[in-house]
Amino acid sequence: TLAASCIRKPTEGMEVTVNSSRAEKSRSMVFELLVSDQPSKEQSPDPDSKFWNWSEKMGVSTSRFPGKEKINLDRSHKAMSVNLDACINCNLCVRACREVQVNDVIGMAYRGSTAKVIFDLDDPMGESTCVACGECVQACPTGALMESSLVNEEGTRVNYSDRTVDSVCPYCGVGCQTKVHVKDDKILYVDGKDGPANENRLCVKGRFGFDYIKHEGRLTKPLIR
């Protein structure tokens, strides 16, 4: 029988087939159903997201099924953009907020086809108790949650890095390791790195507090007396 690999417990002597025609057809159907509720790839929050990369591998770009009703873009937060039109209800953001950062701001609400991710009591993100750690952004596979600095007015990503640099957060003494995404020698965004102190996690300062780099009072060369 077919079963999701994430819930099937292995047992001794089990034989697993992942590339049978039945399994591949089932995966394609799942992606086609998910694509039906997505904006087109060109208008999605992140055309280069994990979701669209996997969709391309599965050979699924369009769907024969009707889509859900469009959900308006939420730009109420200064640092993050919310486009639930691209959400696939995977619950990764919920778990990132609740289990990884233990903030418990994000949850699932409503039932059936109306089920969706909410902040607190279905408040706009910018009016919720969100502490802006950005763990949900790092976990999201579709771009439904994105750094505001990366998207245009329509909520589509337009800024991509040309290289990444491993670094350490300069604020407190914890020593959180970071992965800095750079374009034209300017920082676009920062992700958490799997270091011993932070294990991929960051706080609001580590993820979004890099504007000091452009401050006119910052020393960029050694001072010699």
PLM feature spans:
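Structured interaction patches on ligand/partner-binding surfaces of diverse proteins
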Residues: S5-T11
